[in-house]
């Protein structure tokens, strides 16, 4: 294990109040030490590295200038919050990031008063900040509210809805646009910094306020003339922007790694701003760590790594990942069917659609962080006879539910939804768990809902989705590697609404939806050994259900247990509804539904999370024994 970095200045800073005692000339050294601390911590835990390294100076400057936590500081998404955590009383736990019982990898209200708003999904900061700014006005409190949002998050419509509303309300809100991709405009050196300072200073802001007061005094007839004069002055100084059209006073771009640029602007805004202000700051992802600077995409999210070389720890997989199996199967099918297109919302690598883009660049679309648009865009393609695969993580599909209902399901359009990261996802915790997709999709008429039990089943479901044109269809699969089954050369087309029995028994029936099948088979071994002959089936479909299979289980077994890595209201609830409506519960059938517990489960390794939820081998056996009034045999479910 490498030695901890030497951080004499950072050792003096536990909270932002300590930071404010430092001289401006000390801050560059503090930034170097915060970077060293963060690099060392993430090298031991893994996590999001590049984004945090890019905002070290910005984070220090904000905490130096503003009176946090009384002034509210909100980070969008939260990938960049590690320096913030180091400076807000959590440095002693920074090497527990994303570990069980450790610090969250995102901002979290329950963790610190310095996290006024939790985040993990994108583009929420301006809306939340606006709510807090209006609350401060209603309370007649002069606290400032600062929302830090990345240029990537600005691709989502919600950010613009909030900007539009903030401008209309003339809210006292500070938005800092962290442009770490140089995608909007780079700073142009000393002149840019000077103009930004000038634009944020008392003179120009005073003119703007004077214009408002004069308009109020003389009436609206003079408003257009004053507006033209103010806009001319603003455009002359900084260049007119769409943010200004929305009512924001726009400053920048400025160098986000220069305290000489950041501190004067932030102080001017703190002391003079009365309406909404947007500060455009340009930063470099991975700043200060050469491997991350050279390959920002590879160091966005990292495993544990060697600080000296940057080499990340790699565990040799026992089987291909579900994501790679999906990608390979989709490319295979797209080679045979030129109507197949892929859609991703800023996650081409995470969803595997980068492979489709490499093979068929004109048939793969990255729409940015815009899940709502992605789904309706897919609906438009489907309406014209294409076969769109809108590949989204389960947690992000939630963001587009109205589009799934209104634009896809009601119209019966055959949009295909590959749902990645289904179930527990481990270190990213409850904000990224794939908990609810089965529950919210099975409520929709005409929607086919599948889950892959293993990587071979996933390949079958890709081909099934290609062949299915009668309406929308989804298939879910987890993060991580498969179980190591033999793989078909090409997937088979499954019969819609038909499951499969993988082990015959007579007393207990385990009906699995998804990848809990492997644990069901292990549990069946223990139950057989305890004298409880057990049937195991892979449901494949939560909608439509395999009614014949369920009736067979109900009539020929003493007990039925459904098992799924999803929330209450999903597959098990669909089975229960069917059994109830058919009168199959009237003769004493014992039935239990194993689902994710009705809590927000904290980060841990997925296997530990499944064990805690009772969804593993031991939990299934224990549920059977309790339902049958038997004690848990020592060594069977232990």
Swiss-Prot record:
InterPro entries in alphabetical order: Dxylulose-5-P_synthase, THDP-binding, Transketo_C/PFOR_II, Transketolase-like_Pyr-bd, Transketolase_C, Transketolase_CS
Disulfide bond sites: none
| Cofactor: binding comment | Binds 1 Mg(2+) ion per subunit. Binds 1 thiamine pyrophosphate per subunit.
Taken from the record, one Pfam family name reads DXP_synthase_N
Q: Domain of life, per the record?
A: Bacteria
Q: What is its EC number?
A: 2.2.1.7
Known catalytic reactions: D-glyceraldehyde 3-phosphate + pyruvate + H(+) = 1-deoxy-D-xylulose 5-phosphate + CO2
Q: What class of enzyme is it?
A: transferase
Binding of thiamine diphosphate: at which residues? 79, 120-122, 152-153, 180, 289, 371
**The protein's required cofactors:** Mg(2+); thiamine diphosphate
GO terms (BP aspect) = 1-deoxy-D-xylulose 5-phosphate biosynthetic process; glyceraldehyde-3-phosphate metabolic process; terpenoid biosynthetic process; thiamine biosynthetic process
**Under which pathway is this protein filed?**
Metabolic intermediate biosynthesis; 1-deoxy-D-xylulose 5-phosphate biosynthesis; 1-deoxy-D-xylulose 5-phosphate from D-glyceraldehyde 3-phosphate and pyruvate: step 1/1
Which keywords does this Swiss-Prot/TrEMBL entry list?
Answer: Isoprene biosynthesis, Magnesium, Metal-binding, Thiamine biosynthesis, Thiamine pyrophosphate, Transferase
Q: Which Gene3D superfamilies does the UniProt entry name for this protein? A: 3.40.50.920, 3.40.50.970
Which PANTHER family does this chain map to? 1-D-DEOXYXYLULOSE 5-PHOSPHATE SYNTHASE-RELATED, 1-DEOXY-D-XYLULOSE-5-PHOSPHATE SYNTHASE, CHLOROPLASTIC
Complexes and interactors: Homodimer.
This molecule's function is given as: Catalyzes the acyloin condensation reaction between C atoms 2 and 3 of pyruvate and glyceraldehyde 3-phosphate to yield 1-deoxy-D-xylulose-5-phosphate (DXP).
Q: What is this protein called?
A: 1-deoxy-D-xylulose-5-phosphate synthase
